[in-house]
């Protein structure tokens, strides 16, 4: 039996966040466990650099919300830490060895870049391992999820194809928020060049709905190339990628900074709406 008076007296921010999750799922009196069987909370990590106190802090705060939720409601919970390790390397971090070697891999997925420390399969794998070790040392209850593994295994395929089929609606949402020069080349899809291995931000010349493929000009070949959008051949632009994860995992809660609140959070919900039409 929920003591509503006690719950309403809980003013600390983790409880306020937990109550938002409860409200989303029917409220205190009519709470319904999600169809997946648990409430899912997510944290994110960009392994283009070593994990730091900010990464740790996000997991700490999300765990506080998770614990507050469990204090109020008797419902299974799960926390996943999602690594964006399929992102392209944008710049070489200052606090790593072999910087000149890494310079050659700018633009390539983090899990396709050699580990400058020489210990793991890739730079992305190295940083993922550091994060997991960091979290395990403090006994966090979490499940680690790799973007590369999810894209390449096909786990995201169904949602990606849904996005592909509804890409005009998504463009209608995103394009008004972009600068003029960015509007000309923006696409929800970032193809990964089979020639250079880079994650490309290029104009998509054609979306072929029958074959679920896109055609783009590969700058490393200077010619048009056709590729499928699933099975890790493309990744999604970050805002669409974020919404795709929420849909694929059925995420109930994720903390976000200023760039993912207000307008960006509205985009997230709009993406979810668009791809469900």
For the regions a language model picked out, list residue spans one by one.
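Charged, often glycine-rich, active-site loop that binds/positions anionic groups
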Residues: 86-102, 159-160, 164
């Amino acid at each position: 039996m929920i003591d509503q008076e006690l719950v309403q007296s809980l003013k600390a921010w983790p409880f306020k966040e937990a109550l938002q999750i409860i409200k989303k799922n029917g409220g205190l009196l009519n709470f319904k466990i999600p169809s997946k069987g648990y409430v899912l909370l997510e944290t994110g990590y960009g392994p283009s650099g070593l994990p730091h106190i900010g990464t740790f802090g996000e997991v700490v705060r999300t765990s506080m919300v998770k614990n507050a939720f469990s204090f109020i409601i008797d419902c299974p919970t799960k926390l996943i830490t999602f690594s964006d390790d399929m992102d392209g390397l944008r710049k070489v971090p200052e606090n790593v060895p072999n910087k000149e070697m890494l310079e050659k891999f700018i633009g390539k997925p983090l899990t396709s870049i050699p580990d400058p420390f020489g210990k793991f399969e890739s730079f992305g794998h190295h940083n993922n391992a550091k994060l997991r070790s960091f979290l395990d040392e403090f006994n966090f209850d979490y499940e680690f999820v790799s973007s590369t593994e999810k894209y390449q295994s096909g786990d995201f395929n169904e949602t990606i194809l849904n996005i592909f089929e509804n890409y005009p609606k998504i463009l209608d949402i995103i394009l008004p928020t972009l600068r003029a020069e960015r509007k000309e080349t923006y696409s929800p899809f970032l193809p990964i060049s089979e020639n250079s291995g880079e994650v490309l931000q290029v104009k998509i010349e054609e979306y072929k709905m029958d074959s679920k493929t896109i055609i783009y000009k590969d700058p490393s070949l200077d010619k048009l190339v056709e590729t499928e959008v699933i099975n890790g051949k493309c990744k999604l632009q970050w805002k669409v990628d974020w919404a795709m994860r929420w849909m694929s995992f059925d995420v109930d809660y994720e903390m976000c900074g200023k760039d993912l609140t207000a307008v960006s959070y509205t985009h997230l919900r709009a993406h979810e709406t668009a791809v469900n039409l």
